[in-house]
A protein has these predicted regions:
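Short linear motifs at secondary-structure transitions and domain/linker junctions
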Residues: 10-13, 27-32, 63-68
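A short beta-strand-loop structural module common to alpha/beta enzyme folds
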Residues: 31-41
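Short helix-loop-beta junction
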Residues: 19-32, 110-113
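Helix-loop-strand module that forms the ligand-binding subsite of alpha/beta enzymes
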Residues: 39-113
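N-terminal beta1-alpha1 ligand-phosphate binding loop
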Residues: 2-26
Length: 113
């Protein structure tokens, strides 16, 4: 069985709706166990548990949400000794094209050791 971590932040509900749809779809797979967490609730232990991660965020001022950035701030350096290099996906709720948020999430996630 594979472990999938879904981490998201939503202020207005749009990203939460998307996250719930992703979670429903992933939960239908028999060989996938999911953890579905708001960004403020996720931590290093969740990251270490995961075989793959899906990040969800609204695009705020061309960037990811502060809550998702907080998750990265809390886990990036503590993750260093664990050699985390997981497959990941990103979804963005956006009034623009969302590329700013995707670009910055990519930059951070690819930097995990």
């Amino acid at each position: 069985m594979k472990n999938l971590l879904i981490i998201y932040h939503s202020q207005s509900g749009g990203t939460a709706s998307m996250a719930e749809a992703v979670h429903r779809g992933c939960s239908q797979e028999d060989d996938v166990k999911t953890r579905f967490l708001r960004a403020f609730d996720a931590n290093l232990d969740d990251l270490l548990w995961a075989d793959a991660i899906i990040f969800g965020t609204p695009e705020n001022f061309g960037y990811m949400s502060g809550a998702l950035k907080d998750f990265f701030d809390r886990t990036f350096y503590p993750a260093e000794p664990h050699q985390i290099n997981l497959p990941y996906g990103i979804f963005v709720s956006s009034g623009n094209d969302g590329t700013g948020a995707v670009r910055e999430i990519d930059r951070i996630v690819k930097g995990y050791p």
